[in-house]
C-alpha cells in the first residue's frame, strides 16, 4: 500500500512542472520543424505540403469539411497562438525570391530540373521501397478472405454468414489472420462462414494516398467499395478492435438493415452530449504527461504534427534498416507481424486517422449507436480491466448511455491481450454471438 502511494506521488511529481517544461520545448520544436519541413518540401518536391498549423478557414480544400476533427487545428501551441507562424507561412515566398530553393534543386537534382513535375505516390519523407508503394496498382483495400472451398459451397445448401474484421491503429489484417482466424470454423453444422479481414485505408498493404484526409467517411466508403459491393454482401456481421470500432460502428450504421451483429473490443468511446467530443477524446487518449513512457510517446505523436513527421522520417522511411537491426539484436530470422505492421503507414495516414477517426469520429458515434439499436442490431462490447490505452470508463459510459449494449470486462487483460491471451475463447464467443443474431427485432 505504501509502495503504491509512493509510486503515485512520484508519477504526480514527474507529470507536474517538468511535464509543462518539456511540452513547452516541444511547442518550440514543432514550430521550428514546421519551418524546416516547409523549406525541405520546396526543395525536394517544388511545393510546400500543407499542414494544420493554419486556421481551417484560411486553408482547407477538403469537400467534406464536417468530417475533419477540430483537434487538427485546435491543438494548443504557445508559439502558434502568439502569431509566430506568420514567418513560416511566408518562408516559401522568401526562399524563392532569394533563389535558395532553385540553387539547392540544381545542386541535388541536376538531371530533373528540366523535367515536368508530377505527383508521386509518396512524400520524400515516406519510404519509397517496392513494398511500401505496391498499392499504386490498385484503388481498393487489401482484403484477406477465409472461406470454405468452392466445391464445399456448391455441395452444401447451408446459408453463408459474412463477417468483416476491422483492425485498430498501427495494425493490419494480420492482427486477425495470424490469431483469431486459426480458431474460427469455416463451416459449422448449420452455417458456412466467409471471413473478410481488411487493411484499412493508409495501413498495411492498402492504398496510402497522400491527398486523402483519412476521414471516417473515407474509411467507410473504401470498405464498401472493396468488400461489400464486390462480394454483393446483403447481410454481414462486424468485428472490430480499438480505432477500428469507430469505423466498424459507422459502417454498420450505414448498412443497418444488413448488419446482424457488431462485436467491439476496447472501443475508444467518448460521449458527445455537450459537443466538443473530439477535443475531449484527444485530452483523454493523449494527455500531456511524461509518465508512463507509452503515454508520453502517444502525447508527443498526437499533439505535434511536425515532430510526428520527423519520427516517421526516422523510423518508417528507414524501416528496413531498423528491421535488420532488430533481427541482429534479437537473433530472429523473421520478425513478428506486429512489429512489421507498426511502420506500414505514412505520417499522413497515421496522423489523420488518429485525429479524424479516433478524435473526430467521437462526434458521430452516439448517432451511429442509436441507429444500430433502433434497427435491432445486437452489440457486444468487451475490454480488459488492465487497459491503459483506452480508459475502462469508456465501457461504462457506453453502457450507461446505451443500456441495450452488452458489455463484458475481462479480468487481467489489457488493450491487446484481451484477444491475444484468449484467442480460442474469443473465437468461440464470436461464433456464439453470430449464432444468436439471426433475427433482428427493430426497437
UniProtKB/Swiss-Prot annotation:
Disulfide bonds, paired cysteine numbers: none
Write down the EC number: 3.1.1.-
Lipid bilayer topology:
Lipid-anchor
Name the residues where the record annotates lipidation as N-palmitoyl cysteine. Answer: 53
Q: Where is the signal peptide?
A: 1-52
Question: What keywords does the record list, in alphabetical order?
Answer: Cell membrane, Cell wall, Cell wall biogenesis/degradation, Hydrolase, Lipoprotein, Membrane, Palmitate, Secreted, Signal
Which GO MF terms are attached to this record? Answer: hydrolase activity
Q: Which GO terms describe its biological process?
A: cell wall organization
Q: Does the keyword Cytoplasm apply?
A: no
Residue ranges of every copy of the AB hydrolase-1 domain listed in the record: 163-268
Asked whether the UniProt record includes Signal among its keywords, one would answer yes
Query: Do you know which InterPro entries this protein is assigned to?
Result: AB_hydrolase_1 (IPR000073), AB_hydrolase_fold (IPR029058)
The organism sits in which domain of life?
A: Eukaryota
Q: Provide GO CC annotations from the record.
A: extracellular region; plasma membrane
Spell out the coiled coil positions from the record.
none
Residues of the active site are 167, 242, 387, 415
Where, per UniProt, does this protein localize? Cell membrane; Secreted, Cell wall
Q: What does this protein do?
A: Involved in cuticle development and morphogenesis.
This one is known as Probable lysophospholipase BODYGUARD 5
Organism equals Arabidopsis thaliana (Mouse-ear cress)
Q: Which gene encodes it?
A: BDG5
Amino acid at each position: 500500500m505504501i509502495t503504491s502511494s509512493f509510486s503515485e506521488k512520484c508519477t504526480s511529481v514527474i507529470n507536474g512542472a517538468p511535464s509543462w517544461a518539456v511540452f513547452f520545448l516541444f511547442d518550440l520544436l514543432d514550430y521550428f520543424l514546421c519551418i524546416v519541413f516547409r523549406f525541405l518540401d520546396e526543395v525536394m518536391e517544388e511545393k510546400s505540403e500543407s499542414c494544420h498549423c493554419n486556421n481551417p478557414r484560411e486553408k482547407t480544400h477538403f469537400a467534406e469539411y464536417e468530417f475533419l476533427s477540430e483537434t487538427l487545428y485546435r491543438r494548443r501551441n504557445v508559439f502558434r497562438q502568439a502569431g509566430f507562424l506568420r514567418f513560416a507561412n511566408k518562408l516559401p515566398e522568401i526562399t524563392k525570391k532569394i533563389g535558395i530553393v532553385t540553387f539547392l534543386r540544381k545542386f541535388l537534382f541536376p538531371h530533373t530540373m528540366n523535367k515536368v513535375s508530377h505527383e508521386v505516390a509518396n512524400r520524400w519523407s515516406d519510404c519509397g521501397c517496392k513494398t511500401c508503394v505496391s498499392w499504386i496498382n490498385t484503388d481498393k483495400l487489401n482484403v484477406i478472405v477465409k472461406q470454405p472451398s468452392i466445391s464445399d459451397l456448391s455441395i452444401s445448401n447451408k446459408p453463408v454468414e459474412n463477417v468483416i474484421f476491422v483492425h485498430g491503429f498501427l495494425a493490419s489484417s494480420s492482427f486477425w489472420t495470424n490469431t483469431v482466424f486459426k480458431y474460427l470454423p469455416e463451416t459449422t453444422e448449420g452455417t458456412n462462414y466467409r471471413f473478410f479481414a481488411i487493411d484499412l485505408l493508409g495501413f498495411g498493404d492498402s492504398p496510402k494516398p497522400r491527398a486523402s484526409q483519412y476521414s471516417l467517411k473515407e474509411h467507410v466508403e473504401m470498405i464498401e467499395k472493396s468488400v461489400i459491393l464486390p462480394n454483393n454482401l446483403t447481410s454481414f456481421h462486424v468485428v472490430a478492435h480499438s480505432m477500428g470500432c469507430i469505423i466498424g460502428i459507422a459502417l454498420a450504421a450505414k448498412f443497418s438493415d444488413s448488419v446482424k451483429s457488431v462485436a467491439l473490443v476496447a472501443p475508444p468511446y467518448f460521449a458527445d452530449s455537450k459537443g466538443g467530443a473530439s477535443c475531449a477524446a484527444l485530452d483523454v487518449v493523449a494527455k500531456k504527461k511524461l509518465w508512463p513512457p507509452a503515454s508520453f510517446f502517444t502525447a508527443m505523436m498526437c499533439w505535434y504534427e511536425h515532430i510526428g513527421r520527423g519520427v516517421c522520417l526516422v523510423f518508417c522511411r528507414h524501416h528496413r534498416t531498423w528491421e535488420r537491426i532488430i533481427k541482429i539484436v534479437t537473433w530472429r530470422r523473421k520478425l513478428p507481424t506486429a512489429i512489421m505492421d507498426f511502420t506500414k503507414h505514412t505520417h499522413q495516414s497515421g496522423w489523420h486517422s488518429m485525429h479524424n477517426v479516433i478524435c473526430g469520429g467521437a462526434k458521430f458515434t452516439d448517432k451511429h449507436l442509436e441507429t444500430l439499436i433502433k434497427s435491432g442490431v445486437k452489440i457486444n462490447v468487451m475490454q480488459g480491466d488492465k487497459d491503459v490505452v483506452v480508459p475502462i470508463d469508456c465501457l461504462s459510459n457506453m453502457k450507461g448511455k446505451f443500456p441495450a449494449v452488452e458489455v463484458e470486462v475481462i479480468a487481467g487483460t489489457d488493450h491487446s491481450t484481451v484477444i491475444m491471451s484468449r484467442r480460442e475463447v474469443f473465437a468461440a464467443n464470436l461464433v456464439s454471438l453470430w449464432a444468436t443474431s439471426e433475427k433482428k427485432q427493430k426497437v
